Amino acid sequence: MKKEELRLIFMGTADFAVPALRALVENGYQVKAVVTMPDKPMGRGHKVSPSMVKLYAQELGLPILQPDNLNEESFLDELRTYQPHLQIVVAFRMLPRSVWQMPPMGTINLHGSLLPMYRGAAPINHAIRHGDTETGVTTFRLRHEIDTGEVLLQEKLPIGHEETFGELYERMATLGASVLVHTVDLFLEGEPVSIPQEQLPGYVGARPAPKIFKDDCRIDWDKPAEEVHNFIRSISPAPTAWTKLHRPGMESIVLKIYRTQVIEREPRHRGRFGSIIWDKKNLDVMTRKGVIRILSLQMPGKKQMDAASFLNGFALSSDMYIE
């Protein structure tokens, strides 16, 4: 089959999916329609806004479907009118069987991990949080159980020791777009080979990567410095790690922490975890084992700033601590 004959439906919502859609179109594939979530309130002002995928699809002039319910017969009927050979899912939502079984070639998904590692909604975050030095992307055939389908292609990607979620997210989206195009290329040649996840070389079982909520983002300083550092960078810039600066006799302040550095893995300073060590330029916090240097943070109602700016405008005292 030729590229111009292969009819594709693309399903995605988050900005992670935009490079994948762009790559398919720029490589000559015929995306007949884009399925994305309905417009919804976003941000502090709760302004009703479209998804990033919808905005890009509008630029391309592609038909856009925004069903509230993926099982609605009206949506299924409209989807059938495009007679897709293959459906592609990137950063979307769980599909009912009636949708993913519709195309004769099936439905494939791009996932931000080396499956079966980190099945779930937040694979990139969890890879950083666990201190992994390597991750990757996977394309696989969609099945009913989430992220369990047979693997088509995988490609590895190193994780920098100081790399944040936001930085890795962008690199993963770019890599994923390339791997997805190569995967769709395989369908032009016939039925691609796919491998059950439990038969992959080095298989040691699955690891979950559940969605991360704001309530999960408080920093626990009663952990080794390396774990605290990984936790903070795994959710930077969003949903953002936070902690409380306690000021005796005054209300505590919530601080958002964006970037840190491990300066001591073995404790040389004595004191309780959460104790603060500072000078004119550096803001350090003791953990259960080792010391973390805060490089970038944010106070309520203020912009993100470096530690030196914070110290220049905020008077710390020896009886204050972080928890």
From Swiss-Prot:
It catalyses: L-methionyl-tRNA(fMet) + (6R)-10-formyltetrahydrofolate = N-formyl-L-methionyl-tRNA(fMet) + (6S)-5,6,7,8-tetrahydrofolate + H(+). GO terms for cellular component: cytosol. Pfam families: Formyl_trans_C (PF02911), Formyl_trans_N (PF00551). The keyword Oxidoreductase does not apply. One of its GO terms (molecular function) is methionyl-tRNA formyltransferase activity. It is an enzyme of class 2 (transferase). It comes from the Bacteria. InterPro entries: Fmt (IPR005794), Formyl_trans_C (IPR005793), Formyl_transf_N (IPR002376), Formyl_transf_N_sf (IPR036477), Formyl_transferase-like_C_sf (IPR011034), Met-tRNA-FMT_C (IPR044135), Met-tRNA-FMT_N (IPR041711). Disulfide bonds: none annotated. Keywords: Protein biosynthesis, Transferase. Its EC number is 2.1.2.9. (6S)-5,6,7,8-tetrahydrofolate binds at S113, L114, L115, P116. HAMAP family: Formyl_trans. PANTHER family: METHIONYL-TRNA FORMYLTRANSFERASE (PTHR11138), METHIONYL-TRNA FORMYLTRANSFERASE, MITOCHONDRIAL (PTHR11138:SF5). Belongs to the Fmt family. NCBIfam families: fmt. Attaches a formyl group to the free amino group of methionyl-tRNA(fMet). The formyl group appears to play a dual role in the initiator identity of N-formylmethionyl-tRNA by promoting its recognition by IF2 and preventing the misappropriation of this tRNA by the elongation apparatus. This is Methionyl-tRNA formyltransferase. The gene is fmt.
